[in-house]
Amino acid sequence: MASQEMFPELGQSPAPGVKSRGVSRSPHPHQQQQQQQHQQHQGQFTGTVTGLDLDSSIATASSFANSSFDPNSNNVSPSAESYGYTAAGYLSGTPASQTDQNYANSLQIPQSYGTGLVPQFNESRGLPIQQQSQQQHHQQPSLDDNFSDLLNSNATEYDFNTVYQTHSPSSNTAPEYDSSLLLDPQVHQQSHPTQIPSSHSSTSPQISPLEQQQHSSPGPMSTQGSTTVAYYTPQHSRHASLDPATAAFLTSNTHPDWQAVMGNSAAFQGHRRAPSEVSEISSAAPSPYLSQHESFDGVDNNPSPLLAPQNDPSLYDSALGIENFTLSEQHQQHQGFSPAHSPYISPRLMPQQGQEMMPNVPYLSGPAPNTQYPTPPNDMYGNGAEGMMNMSQGTHPSVDIGQASQMAPPSINVEFAPPSRIPSFGPSKPASNLDSLSPPPSSTRSRGRSKSDPYAHPSTSRLRSSSTSSSLDPLAPTTPRSLSPFDSFGRQQQSNPSSRDPSPSRSNRRLSTSSIDSRNYILGLADPQRPGASPNDSKRVQKHPATFQCNLCPKRFTRAYNLRSHLRTHTDERPFVCTVCGKAFARQHDRKRHEGLHSGEKKFVCQGELSRGGQWGCGRRFARADALGRHFRSEAGRICIKPLLDEESQERERSLMDQQQHHLQPLPQQVMVPVDNPHAGNFVLPAALLAQYPALQTLQWDQIAASADDPSDIGGRSSFDASSGNEFGFEDDDSGLSSVSGINAGYSAAGNFY
């Protein structure tokens, strides 16, 4: 405030040809180099306006208000020495070669700028102050008029102690910022708002217009002639926002932790100005020390037209160890700074644990050296040094900077166990024949087979007798597991459900209650080696074999009565005549059936009751059984008996589940009448229908045409042959008729049906 009261006119803008330059490290031409020399000692010596030379009258005057400052004498008072300058080296006519050499070395003038400016600068420094002032007036005649009214002619009114009473090293008040955080040699400098220059270059006559265009400020609002525009500059030092030492990287010499920086540094206590393009002291302005300036416009974006960005060797020289970082070196110890120093959790740092939190797992890490008990070896099979997992042995490493990123990934080595010399998992398996298709022995199986499995019965039969234990041999010719078709006799003795032996299902085998039992049952029926599948099986052996052969045709019959009725068909003998119409028939059964038509009685009705309730059929009535059979073979008749077929299928599945739950044997074949003739289309009548109309069991389906019945068959000859049905017996292809019932063998005449 004292400087503002003494120089009230300093707030005005300078002449159009001159712009006030602030604290800049840019080596300008002759005029700006002298400005920077004065500004270097500004915070320690004087408060004159930037860019002004001392007048000769002021330089020779001896009546200063401050008696410690005498420019003509070499004696410096103690107060002047405390400011760090000597009058002989600064204001005397003697060339200050040492000062020039130090200042010239501190500036790195790039080769792109004219080197002819340096001799001009050095030659002018060797002249006395008065000659320099005259030379300055000859070179720039307009500058004397611009700055002549800025200095007071009375030299006694300059009170330098009053101006710099708060920034001297001997002052009682501390500066606004910590001097240890600054890299600039001007440690105690305070920038006045009128002394801070704008970002535009000055129009010096010693700079060519081409250089002015090249090194102009990159600001979007800057023009070469706009020097009268006044810019707003806030009242704080540029070191608080541009000093690299106040960045987030700590050094080992300043503060040990983040709390000291955040608590003691004044740069983090105040408000920072937002980035601006027109402010010189904005935090967005790049620093000349910052070589990592992210700009895609080249070096023309630098704030100084004559100084390229350069590194600060004290801070940015291999600060983070990026220059020495390689991906191939996994165990490299980085000497830079890490976010681990920060009290805040970094999202880029992997979680780490100390030694006291890590469990002592033998397969994951090495045991601690001071364990109370010996650690068991990692080698499970006694192979030596190699275990199941090849991990590093040793103590847990302490938590270090970047320790999580330096850990090598664990490697897993899979080693197969050596072959066991001692059988530890039960008896060894017998050598099986690879050519056989038999299942494995039941001794190694944990669960038994289902009841419909044909292999389940022989596996349990060896428990009852020692003589059948040899059946486990897969090469035995009489084994039930053999695929030979000639071992059915041995199968009957072991797996016949009708044998005298105890039921194999009552043994100590666990039964399966799977939901696909019907599938196993169907597969068992399709097995040609299943019990009862062979015609030589005791269950399927006919009690009356077809031993009566016809000498005129290949038909065979079980009874002599049936053979005689058949021979009448060849001789066309019809001894049985109808009493109503006189129609003759070869069989007694055919005449009785024909006489029923004359009476009008139709006792064959397509209707019946279901076991679960309800009725089936269409209700049509037929006088003959063959007419009802033809009806069932038609499309309408198939729809009529479909409820019976569905009910029978459900009953079969229910009975199969009951067998498995109650350890019962498989049921015998369902009472059906399968038709083996290919012309019949495998027509099968339900068992309930056959039980309701037993006459349907004796029908010769191969001789019944699949057409509508003809009720006018009274006078004509019957379409049947002379046999009554019972006399034909069982042929080779009619073996399915034997499973209907046993009533057919008891009839000696056809009249017993009625």
Swiss-Prot record:
GO CC term (a single one): nucleus
GO MF, any single term: RNA polymerase II cis-regulatory region sequence-specific DNA binding
Please list the GO biological process terms of this entry.
cellular response to calcium ion; conidium formation; positive regulation of transcription by RNA polymerase II; regulation of DNA-templated transcription; spore germination; unidimensional cell growth
Where is there biased composition of kind Polar residues? Answer: 63-80, 94-114, 141-150, 210-227, 279-293
Q: Where in the cell is it found?
A: Nucleus; Cytoplasm
Q: Which UniProt keywords apply?
A: Cytoplasm, Metal-binding, Nucleus, Repeat, Transcription, Transcription regulation, Virulence, Zinc, Zinc-finger
Quick one: where is this thing mainly located? nucleus
Q: List residue spans of C2H2-type Zn fingers.
A: 548-570, 576-598, 604-635
- Ranges of biased composition (kind: Low complexity): 30-44, 130-140, 189-209, 459-472, 491-515
Q: Which Pfam families match?
A: zf-C2H2
Q: List the disulfide bonds.
A: none
PANTHER family in the cross-refs: PROTEIN ESCARGOT, ZINC FINGER PROTEIN
The protein's role, per its UniProt record: Transcription factor involved in the regulation of calcium ion homeostasis. Regulates genes encoding calcium transporters, transcription factors and genes that could be directly or indirectly involved in calcium metabolism. Supports especially pmcA, pmcB and pmcC expression encoding for calcium-translocating P-type ATPases. Binds target promoters at motif A[GT][CG]CA[AC][AG]. Plays an essential role germination, radial growth, and asexual development. Also plays a major role in proper chitin and glucan incorporation into the cell wall.
Protein name per the record: C2H2 finger domain transcription factor crzA
**Gene coding for it:** crzA
